[in-house]
Amino acid sequence: MKKGEMIYQGKAKKVYETDDKDKVIIYYKDDATAFNGEKKGQITDKGILNNNITSSLFELLEKNNIPTHFEKKLNDREQLCKKVDIIPLEVIVRNVAAGSMAKRLGLEEGTPLKTTVFELSYKDDSLGDPIINDYHAVAIGIATWDELKTIYDMTASINDILELFFRKLGIKLIDFKLEFGKFKDKIVLADEISPDTCRLWDAVTNEKLDKDRFRRDMGNVKEAYEEILRRISDN
């Protein structure tokens, strides 16, 4: 597979075209951002860690019949993926109150929820990725009702698979965000699943093992990501 021109650069990844019009190469960077890009930094080897973590988790989901854009890991920093048309939504899955939801609703972080909460965020940096509801998404043409149902059904299955997987590793899956795209008119999971996109707490100590360590200047960010990869690799 021949690597071509860079066609997109985001906060954490670069996307390159290939000699196959249906495939791209995704490169994972060490750049770290928080608060919609207001806080910026670098975490040594973060790209390597997130590539390895995401590759393992996407392989797990594929084995459990979740369609994804992932094809294979090429090297420490790169994956071969299907070229998808990204749907400009983030689906945020909240199993435990934390982060912005806890602040917004006046809940103590770590409060158990009586049901898992799904939130939608409209992916638009200029607007600060606002929270929207299903009606907004349909009204402004982001997705149809049928597409939202597919996305929610997939999201529920992904949450079940990942929550059980992490529980076996001694990790609480507090919340996470997902992105989806269309490949030949089929909705597939895209982007990444990593400590950049999940809140992951040690099940015994509640130690944070995710990007909150960067957001909140807690230190030992790389070590937390390494611990997640170690537990996944030892499984």
Curated annotation (Swiss-Prot):
Transmembrane segments: none
InterPro entries xrefs: SAICAR_synt/ADE2_N, SAICAR_synt_PurC, SAICAR_synth, SAICAR_synthetase, SAICAR_synthetase_CS
Gene Ontology BP, a term: cobalamin biosynthetic process
SUPFAM superfamilies (UniProt xref): SAICAR synthase-like
The protein's annotated pathway: Purine metabolism; IMP biosynthesis via de novo pathway; 5-amino-1-(5-phospho-D-ribosyl)imidazole-4-carboxamide from 5-amino-1-(5-phospho-D-ribosyl)imidazole-4-carboxylate: step 1/2
PANTHER family reported for this sequence: MULTIFUNCTIONAL PROTEIN ADE2, SI:DKEY-6E2.2
NCBIfam families membership: purC (TIGR00081)
Name of the protein: Phosphoribosylaminoimidazole-succinocarboxamide synthase
Protein's organism: Clostridium kluyveri (strain ATCC 8527 / DSM 555 / NBRC 12016 / NCIMB 10680 / K1)
Gene: purC
